[in-house]
Amino acid sequence: MALQITHHKNFDIEAVGFSKLRKNKSGGKAVYLNVSDKKLYLQLPKLRSPYGLSTYTDDTTGKTSYSLDLSLDTDNTEAMELREKLTQLDELIIKTVVENSKEWLGKKFNEAVCREALYKPLVRQGKEPYPDTVKLKILTSSTGDFVPEAYSTSRERVGLDTITKGSKVTCIVDFVQIWFIDNKFGVTVRLQQALLEPSAKLPSFAFLGVDGASETQAEDEFVDEDEEYEE
C-alpha cells in the first residue's frame, strides 16, 4: 500500500478500515488497520515524554525492547483533541472485534467483556494526579540499532536516545495491527520518526567561570533569574 501521512487534525475515525484476519506460520493472528486501503500513518501533536525511552529485557531470550510513553496533558489542547480521537478509535476497534469475535477470538464475546477484560486500549488511563498516556513501540534492527529516525528542529539527525524525561517531541507513528494473544487484544503503535524540541534544562556541568572561563564569558552567558522557563 502507498504511504500517506495524516495530520492529527485531519484524522477521520470513520475512514479507518480493517483487513481480514491474517495468520502467520507460528499461529499468531493479526488484523491490519488502514485508511482508504493505505497504511495508517499519523502525525501526532507535540507531546511530553514523562520517562524518556523505556527498556525491557526478556530474561529468557536476553532481547531488549524499547518503547516511548507520551503524556496527554490536560493543559495541552492538541493533546486533548488527540485523546478524544484515540478514544473514538478504541471504541471502533472494540465494536469491530465484538462483531468478529467468533472468528478473531475463537468464541463470541459481548462488548462489556471485550472492553473491561480483553482489550488493552490506546489511551492508557493515568493514576491520579498523572495524565493519560499513549505508548509507542520502537523497532530495532538485527544489530540492535534503532530503526526510527530522530531529528532536531534544525533538521539534523540526532540519536533517539536523546529523548529524556520531560522531553517534548512530535512523532509520526504507524498503527500497525490489532494483535491477539490468549484471547486478549490490543493495537501495536510503532514510532517511525521523531522531532525533538530543544531542551530547556540546564546542560551537564553548567557552571560559569570555572576551569579558565573568563568573567566576560560568564557575563555573556548569565541567565536572568526573573526570566521564566518552561520546566
Language-model features, listed with the residues they occupy:
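Extended serine/threonine-enriched, polar tracts that run as long, contiguous segments within proteins
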Residues: 124-199
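Short non-domain terminal segments
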Residues: 9, 16, 203-205, 220, ...
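OB-fold ssDNA-binding interfaces and closely related basic DNA-contact patches used
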Residues: 1-141
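Generic preference for flexible, low-structure residues
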Residues: 102, 109, 152, 185, ...
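Generic alpha-helix signal with a bias toward terminal, lower-confidence helices
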Residues: 45, 54, 98-101, 148, ...
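Acidic, Ser/Thr-interspersed intrinsically disordered low-complexity regions
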Residues: 210-231
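Short peripheral tails and domain-boundary helices/loops at the edges of structured domains
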Residues: 194-212
